[in-house]
Amino acid sequence: MANQVKKYGFVIDPRRCIDCRACLVACRAENNVPLNNTRIWVYDQGIQGAFPNLSQQFVPYNCMHCDEPPCVEACPSQATYKRPEDGLVVIDQQACIGCGLCLPACPYHVRYLNPDTGKADKCNACLQRVEQGEAPACVATCVGGSRLFGDLNDPNSEVYTALREAKSVKRLPAVGVDTGPNFYYINDPVDEKRLAITAPQLPPADAFYKYIVVPGVLLAAGATLVGQAVAFARQLVKGESEYDE
């Protein structure tokens, strides 16, 4: 058990969500999320039931950190990857080329192109906090205890206990494919039809050629032309100097 690899995931209890949106504010502040964009959501499922047995459900929502993430398959530069040490799906901002192919590949629609950087962005579970032993900002700020985060493989973790003791457990499947989301809803059924989850839209087979090979060839060709131009200019200068003598 001591050598077991960590598997981080989220456990959500919608019954405890009061729609205060403190998690959204904390996420934005922690990760410098641009205005008009967000890494996490709280969806209002509306009034349910019939009078006098009425209820209202709020559903916290963000990246599922899937076991089989289509976004990883879609990324031509391998900027999006699943960390082998803990299972979190993250984006290497240095490697991202901003092609946007990962956006439609995500069936949960949790990605966006950051207008400030031109790169893909999404929830990374506040990796900078997790690596310091702290919970993601949204979890640490959740006043109702609706959002939980931890090692799903650790029997002593809060998420493991919550799943074991839950009255019901549900994950949100993508359409037509099992992505293996590490994002669990407990104790209160969630209607995924209201969340607009779709099938992943993977890029065409020539995406790598179009976004990686061709730009690389053009860059190399451009460098070659510049080199030839510099050499030609030097020859002209040399010729003029010899002529002056």
Please describe what each predicted stretch is:
Residues 1-245:
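Non-ligating segments of multi-cofactor redox enzymes
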